[in-house]
UniProtKB/Swiss-Prot annotation:
This is Small ribosomal subunit protein bS6. NCBIfam families: S6 (TIGR00166). Binds together with bS18 to 16S ribosomal RNA. The lineage of its organism: Bacteria, Bacillati, Actinomycetota, Actinomycetes, Acidothermales. One of its GO terms (cellular component) is ribonucleoprotein complex.
Length: 96
């Protein structure tokens, strides 16, 4: 199992109070495979440097998790299929 940091940029039309529960549905993939979600940090609505899908704002969320590489790949695939997710960025902070 490896430590990952996932940043998710969500559509600004989504209500901010429903962000964490909706992300929790996707994170069940990690939990079912034996991984753990350490922290979900919702940064809230912020202005984008450039428009994405004609949106000038987005809701940022950062998630720290421990999971297998295959599980994280499936999580990223599911997030990219969701139309409320504008962008995702997955990094391993301890990989240097």
């Amino acid at each position: 199992m490896r430590h990952y940091e996932l940043m998710v940029l969500l559509d600004p039309d989504v209500e901010e109070r429903s962000v964490e529960p909706s992300l929790d549905q996707f994170l069940n993939v990690v939990r079912q495979d034996g991984g753990t979600v350490q922290k979900i940090d919702v940064w809230g609505r912020r202005r984008l440097a450039y428009e994405i899908r004609k949106k000038s704002e987005g809701i940022y969320a950062v998630i720290d998790l421990i999971a297998n590489p295959q599980t994280v790949k499936e999580l990223d695939r599911q997030l990219n299929l969701n139309e409320n997710v504008l962008r995702t960025k997955l990094v391993r902070p301890d990989a240097r």
